[in-house]
């Protein structure tokens, strides 16, 4: 049975503006009706900012031979046509649908949802939850911290709302990463993550699980225990986060990676990059060369992070953030 849960009315009408006059004239009642009666069979595919026709066919190679853009005699007008008829309800097997969504990341970053996702659970994939609820709740589908980017860059919001851009991430990867004035944050999960910064401006790398509270503010949802993350710097100015301020999820500023866990920092540039720590000064920490690396430890010897190739770095206090954290570089 066809499942149209993916359909986004606003995005469809923005993508195919010639449909709107037919609605205004009363010929059809909605973009959804147009798509079901005409657009789907015609091979229209822009029904959601979180579905990409090319990406779906590239990953689902068993589907491509049955799509009419590849095989004129195929039973499906498009990869989307297959997804609506079968793929959506096949769950995680068909969850690679867009560069704007990663099933592995969504499940790792929203670990509280795991019991609700599976063959016999309310949602057959994380993608189903994301499409029906997650995106509306401010959850995001990749390590790019989408809600904060849109909040800090209101000039691009109209382009996202209109459908000219699918997401803030699309803007950043196509334009923002080349603009020194744009900042971006990449976040991980409570599992082991590899994060790579992108861009010539300010990039923040946070290996732990981060979300937003009901007011749209950042909150930290894990603190690095039993997490072993790799944070890879960008060409721009990076901040590698090993300590966080107080938020709705933690009442006091908190160091990350206490106990079993640590961040491995790569591509650290002493001229441009910073490391964020909890507290007000370096007096609570030891910076100890270990082989070719520099180990960042608490006074008790708990390793929070290691800078690869940083044994000879002379890191010093740079500035206080005024929120219970400070920067060294």
Predicted regions, residues:
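Generic structural signal for residues positioned in beta-strands
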Residues: 129, 171, 185, 204, ...
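Residue-level detector of short, conserved catalytic/binding motifs and their immediate flanks
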Residues: 33, 81, 128, 170, ...
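Generic structural signal for beta-strand residues in well-ordered domains
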Residues: 5, 49, 99, 123, ...
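Charge-rich, low-complexity intrinsically disordered regions
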Residues: 1-186
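Acidic, glycine-rich calcium-binding repeat modules characteristic of RTX/beta-roll
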Residues: 1, 23-27, 184-283
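Low-complexity acidic/polar repeat-biased segments
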Residues: 281, 287-329
């Amino acid at each position: 049975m066809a499942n149209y849960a993916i359909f986004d009315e606003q995005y469809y009408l923005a993508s195919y503006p010639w449909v709107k006059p037919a609605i205004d004239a009363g010929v059809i009642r909605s973009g959804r009706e147009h798509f079901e009666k005409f657009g789907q069979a015609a091979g229209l595919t822009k029904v959601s900012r979180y579905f990409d026709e090319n990406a779906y066919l590239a990953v689902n190679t068993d589907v491509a031979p049955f799509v009419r853009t590849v095989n004129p005699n195929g039973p499906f007008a498009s990869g989307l046509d297959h997804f609506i008829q079968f793929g959506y309800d096949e769950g995680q097997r068909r969850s690679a649908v867009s560069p704007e969504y990663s099933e592995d990341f969504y499940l790792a970053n929203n670990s509280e949802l795991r019991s609700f996702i599976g063959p016999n659970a309310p949602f057959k994939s994380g993608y189903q939850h994301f499409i029906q609820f997650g995106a509306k709740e401010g959850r995001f589908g990749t390590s790019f911290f989408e809600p904060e980017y849109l909040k800090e860059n209101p000039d691009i919001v109209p382009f996202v709302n209109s459908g000219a851009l699918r997401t803030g991430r699309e803007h950043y990867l196509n334009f923002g990463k080349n603009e020194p004035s744009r900042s971006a944050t990449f976040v991980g999960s409570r599992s082991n993550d590899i994060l790579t910064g992108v861009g010539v401006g300010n990039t923040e790398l946070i290996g732990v699980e981060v979300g937003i509270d009901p007011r749209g503010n950042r909150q930290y949802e894990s603190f690095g225990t039993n997490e072993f993350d790799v944070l890879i710097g960008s060409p721009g100015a990076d901040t590698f986060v090993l300590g966080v301020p107080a938020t709705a999820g933690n009442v006091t500023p908190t160091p990350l990676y206490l106990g079993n866990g640590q961040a491995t920092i790569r591509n650290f540039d002493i001229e441009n990059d910073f490391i964020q720590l909890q507290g007000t000064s370096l007096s609570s920490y030891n910076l100890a060369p270990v082989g070719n690396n520099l180990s960042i430890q608490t006074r008790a010897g708990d390793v929070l992070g290691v800078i690869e190739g940083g044994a000879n770095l002379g890191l010093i206090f740079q500035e206080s953030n005024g929120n219970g954290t400070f920067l060294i570089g």
